[in-house]
Amino acid sequence: MTASLRRPATLLTIGQLCREFDVTPRTLRYYEEQGLLAPERREQQRLYSRRDRARLQLILRGRRVGLSLAQIRQVLDLHNPADQDAA
């Protein structure tokens, strides 16, 4: 059985998430560097949860309406204040 068949359906690889949202892997890595996304890491692979998918959706919507990444971070913090406690 391949790793992709054993992986729970709720986790997406960087390639799968890129295809779903029509973004580049570099974009996702940049959002991770900026602290906007925090994918699970298994060895050298990033795995994105449903939560990461929802956060990316909010990030992209914010960018479409002209928000800066700092403004988007504030929106994400309001959307999930538990993240602030972990930081």
Short names for language-model regions:
Residues 35:
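Glycine-centered, phosphate/nucleic-acid-interacting loop/turn motifs that mediate DNA/RNA or nucleotide
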Residues 1-19, 38-42, 50-87:
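Arg/Lys-rich, alpha-helical DNA-contact motif
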Residues 45:
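Conserved catalytic core of two-component sensor histidine kinases, primarily the HATPase_c ATP-binding
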